[in-house]
Amino acid sequence: ISLAGITMLSCLSPTLVCAEQPHGFIDYRHEYLDDTRTHADRVEFGTFFSNGIGLMGELRYNTDEGDKDKWDPSQFGNNGTGLSVVYRFKPLDDKKFWLEPMFWLDTTQYWSTYEYGLSAGYDFSKEWKVSGRFRYDMDKATDKSKGYGNDDRNNRRYDVWIDYRPQKTNFQYQLNLVYYNNGYLTWNDGHKNYTASFKVGYKIGSWIPYMSIADYKGVDKTSSNRQIRWRWGLTYTF
């Protein structure tokens, strides 16, 4: 489900935006996992107001469960939806520092998840920006999920973003580090996990095509195996 931008999505993180003028975005993203060899798609959209409030939605689709090397949008299954509200403000005289509480409601056929989080960031310059987020997720198992032996669970997630947008170029770079402490078996026979991803985008007017590569957990939750996660997409800002 998610988490990682500073101004008009120029730093490639649609869920982190400035409250300076009304604006919005639409983002399409495709994902491929090289070990499971499965595809997934996501469309995210949002609008943000000058008072700091932002509203976002997300639609996710994936290939039929168990199918590998298959990418046929007409055969994609619903992989969940999400709705979010955020509020960005600058509490200090130093206007380079900002805070952003958030709430996200995510639903799939197996879980209804209530996500509460707080982001903080500092804009060192036009080129360098750093932000972080703590998120607490409350997973409520659906009847279908309980049929597989699952129960309600709580999870913690910690994100760090480092954004670099060099002057006199349209390229944009982002490093995202994620640490998970989940209430269920996740990776390496334990409840903890991590993801490290690097993202490159190129701004062309209101469009930002991008690509990312990540060190991602493997299929077997009891081993330390990892796999590569590829993502590429296109963001339109307005």
Name these PLM-found stretches.
Residues 1-25, 238:
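Cleavable N-terminal export/targeting peptides
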Residues 16-68:
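Short glycine/proline- and aromatic-enriched beta-strand/turn motifs that initiate or cap beta-hairpins
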Residues 37-41, 45, 76-83, 112-116, ...:
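Residues that define the transmembrane beta-barrel architecture of outer-membrane proteins
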Residues 44-46, 84-88, 117-121, 159-163, ...:
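Outer-membrane beta-barrel architecture
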Residues 94-97, 113-185, 194:
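Detector for outer-membrane/organellar transmembrane beta-barrel domains
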